[in-house]
Amino acid sequence: ADEGVAVMKIGADGGLTPLNQVGIDGMRGCFLSTDKAGKFLFVGGYHDGKVTVVHTHSDGRLGRVMDGIFHKGLGSVAERNFRPHISCVMPTPDNKFLCVVDSGVDHINIYTVNPTTGRLKMVDILRCELESAPRWIRFSRDGKFAYVICEHSNEILVYTYDGSGRLPEFELVQKVPTYLDNDESAKAASALKISPSGDYLYCSTAGEETV
């Protein structure tokens, strides 16, 4: 059964105290993020391809579901990606847009979030190569670059980002492989993180078992 999202308060000793729990009207969310103001929680659903917006209170508790959108479409790999699989939900650094990474249909859908109602409106789609399976997106510390790790193509896509206009502008400028060699063993790029200094980008690759 779907148990939604639970909130825990972190104590001074590191202990966790439950605050509350809310359902998301979807199947087992796999990724969480918040907007810069801490007003909304975004939930990505891998199994049902749903992005959910939940209101958050100032004390950390969760409120009601404000909006939810199911992605639609057929993926490029029928054996696995025959339907949408949302694997990451991440606001842009300027808090103007929400990037929803869908590894099932090789898309990154870009939404605006109404600051009052929490309603989502899709304004753009970044279309990645078929069978690449984009998994996570991260932004540079200065907010000028976006990095997307692709699970199937085992590469990191580098985009410039400009959110100064009414619509977001992403331009692909580089592709960097995540593997050490070109052997035929099964491998899948998985996670992506930027170092605190912003000087390094870390990624992990399953199968090859490397960082």
Predicted region positions:
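Short loop/turn segments immediately following beta-strands, especially the blade-tip
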Residues: 7-14, 53-63, 111-119, 159-169
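Loop/turn-rich, solvent-exposed surfaces of beta-rich toroidal or solenoidal domains
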Residues: 187-211
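Structural signal for beta-propeller blades
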Residues: 3-5, 49-52, 106-108, 154-156, ...
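Asp-box/WD-like beta-propeller blade repeats and closely related beta-sheet repeat scaffolds
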Residues: 17-88
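Conserved beta-strand positions in repeat-built beta-propeller and related beta-rich domains
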Residues: 1, 43-46, 92, 100-103, ...
